[in-house]
Each structure stands twice: as structure tokens, then as C-alpha cells.
């Protein structure tokens, strides 16, 4: 059985983080990360773009999330999973296990 599930994505926070506490008392922070880059595919440059919902869970990670605002540039590493929305549609979500702020050089 294959069990590898890792994703690293960098980008800019494009939606205001929402903080909630689950019925079991686990704090969660949700936001959306927008990624834009140029990648090489089959010897050609290709513009890539995506918006990825991010979930940060657990008490230890919450202190870091209070510094995250719209416009923050981050590198996020974690695992992906499907979540079913209220509309019944599945969406891919990145569960962050490590977050690093990208220095803008200012």
C-alpha cells in the first residue's frame, strides 16, 4: 500500500483567515493560499496558478496563525485530503503541518 502524501506550496494568503474551535475543543484556522509560478513541462515554460484551501489544526500551531493576514507570503507543508462542502461537492484541502513566512525583502 502506498502511503506517501506530502505537498509543499508557496504563495500569498488571499482570503481572511477564519478561526474556529471544533466541538471536541480543537482549534482550527482556515485560509486560502494563492500560488502563481512558471514551471517547466516537456521542455516548455508553463504558467501555473491555483488557490488551495489551508487548514491549520491544534493548539500548538495557533500562535503562528495569528500573524497570518491577507497578503502574507507563506510556504506551507503538509498533507492533502478531500473535504465535502455544504454544497455536497468535494474539494482538495492542504492540512498544514509546517508554515514558514517568506521574507519579502523589505
From Swiss-Prot:
Molecular function GO labels: single-stranded DNA binding
Residue span, SSB domain: 4-103
Keyword field: DNA replication, DNA-binding, Primosome
Tagged with keyword DNA-binding: yes
GO CC annotation: primosome complex
Keyword match Protease: no
SUPFAM superfamilies: Nucleic acid-binding proteins (SSF50249)
Top-level taxon of the source organism: Bacteria
A Gene Ontology biological process term: DNA replication, synthesis of primer
Gene3D superfamilies: Nucleic acid-binding proteins
Function, in words: Involved in the restart of stalled replication forks, which reloads the replicative helicase on sites other than the origin of replication; the PriA-PriB pathway is the major replication restart pathway. During primosome assembly it facilitates complex formation between PriA and DnaT on DNA; stabilizes PriA on DNA. Stimulates the DNA unwinding activity of PriA helicase.
Assembly description: Homodimer. Interacts with PriA and DnaT. Component of the replication restart primosome. Primosome assembly occurs via a 'hand-off' mechanism. PriA binds to replication forks, subsequently PriB then DnaT bind; DnaT then displaces ssDNA to generate the helicase loading substrate.
Family: Belongs to the PriB family.
Protein name per the record: Replication restart protein PriB
Source organism per UniProt: Yersinia enterocolitica serotype O:8 / biotype 1B (strain NCTC 13174 / 8081)
Organism taxonomic ancestry: Bacteria, Pseudomonadati, Pseudomonadota, Gammaproteobacteria, Enterobacterales
Gene: priB
